[in-house]
Amino acid sequence: MEKSTPYKIDQNLSYFYTLDEKNIFALELKHLLQDEDPFYVALLENDPTNNNTPEADGFYSTANVLGLDTGLDVYELNQNRRVKSNQLDAKLDYYYILNEKSNLNFVGGTILSKQNFDSRFFQVLDSQGTTLDPTPIFGADPLTSNDIEYKFTDLYLGLRYRVKSGIFTFSPGFTAHAFNTNNSQYGTDFFKDTFQKILPEFKMIMQFKRSESLTLDYRQQVNFTDVNQLAKGLVANGYNAFFAGNSDIMNASIHNVSLFYRSYNLYNASNVFARVAYTKTIDQISTDFNFVPGSVVSFRTNLNSPFDNETLTAFGRIGKTFKKIRTSIGGNFTYSKSFQFLQGNVNENLLYNHSYNTSVGTNFTKAPNVRLRYRVSFTDQISGNRDDFNTVTHVPSLNFDAYIWDSLTFKSDFSFNEVKQDGNVTNSFKIWDMTLAYRKNKDAKWEYELIGSNLLGTDSRTTVNAGNISRSINETFILPRFVSLRLRYQL
C-alpha cells in the first residue's frame, strides 16, 4: 500500500508604519514550504500467449512502445514522484507624500524560490518487488526518471508617481528586475539564464463624478514556469499519456492594456459597467502534442512558441429600475488567437465568442416576485486544418419566489437549455426545482421545508467541446427526480 503524506505551510506577514504625515512604510512577507508526493499505480491484464498475433491484447502495442516486459500476466506500472518547494517573497513599499495631490511610491523586494523534483516510472515484475526501468521508443531522450533542482531569483526596485489634476489622476511607473534562473538535472546537465528587464506601467483615472469614472491601465509582465515543466524525464499522466519537460524553456513576456467604465446613478436608479481588455503574450510556453504510431500513447512536451498569442475581451451591462421593476441588458465578446503544435506541425486557432443576456423582474417587499432571464451565446472556432466549429446556445429561465401569510415561503426555478452545433440541435434539456418552507413566525423554533429537485425527470445533459487537438461530446447524468422533507430546529 502506497502512502502519500503531502503538506503545505503558507505564512504571511503584513506590517504598516506611519512615521509622520509625509512618510509611510508597508512591509509584506510571504513564505511557502510545500512537499508533494503523488504516486501512480496501474494494473492492466495481459495474455502473454497471444503476443505478436492478430489476437494480441489491446495494450500489447502500447507496452512495446513503452519498453515493458510483455511476458507477464499483469502489467503493474508504478510511478513515484516528489516535488519540494521553498519560496520567500519580500516587498517593502515606501510612500512619500509630496502634497495633497501627488505622492511617490518607492518599492523594493525579492522572490527567492527553490524546487526539487524527483520521479521514477517503472514496472513491477514479481511479488518479490523486482522492478524494470523501461526504455520507451518515443521522445528525443526517453528517460523514465527525474532528478532536478531549480532555483529562481528576482531582485527588483521600482518607482511610481501619482498626481491628480482636475478630473485626471495619472500613475506612471516602472520596476527594474534582475532575474536569475538555473536548473541542474541528474547532477550533470546544467542550464542558467541571467538577465535584467525594466517593466513599465501606467494608469489613468478620469473621475467625472464620485459615482462615474473611466480607468485606463497598462502594464508589462514576465511569466516564468516551474520545475514540473523543466524536468526532462518522462512523467506518466496515465498508462498511455506521458509528458517530458524542456530545460531550455525561457520566460514569456506579457502586455496587458484595459479600459474600464463604471457609473452609478441613484437618482434614476441605473448603473452601467463596461470593460475592454487586450493581452499579447510573446514567447508563450506552449505544448507540443505527439502520438506514437501504432499505439494509443500520446506524448507531450513544451516549447516557447515563435508566434504571439492574442486575446481581446469586452463586456458591458446596463441595469435600470422602474419603480418595482428591475431590468438589465448585457453582452460579452471574446476573441483569441493561439497556435497548436501537433506532430511537429503548427496550426493557427481562432476563437470568437459573443453572448447577450437580458432580464426583467419585480422587486416587491411583500408581494410575490418573478424574474425572467434570457441568454444566447455564439461560439465560432476556426482552425486551419479542420472544419470550422460553430455552436449556438439558448438559455431562457424563470424564477419565482413568494412569502405568504408571514409564514410560508415558496420558490421555483425553471430553465431550458438548447445547444445547436453547426445548425443542428445536439442537446436540449429542462430543469425545474421547487422549495416550499413553513415557519409559523420569525420567533418559531421549528421550520419545515419540502424540496423538489429535477421535477421534470431530466436524465442527462450533453456539452460539445472543441479543444486544440480534439473535439469531444460529454454527457453529464443528472440525479433523478427527488423530493425530500427537511426539518430544522433553531436552538
Please place each PLM-identified region on the residue numbering.
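Primarily recognizes Gram-negative and organellar outer-membrane beta-barrels
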Residues: M1-Q490
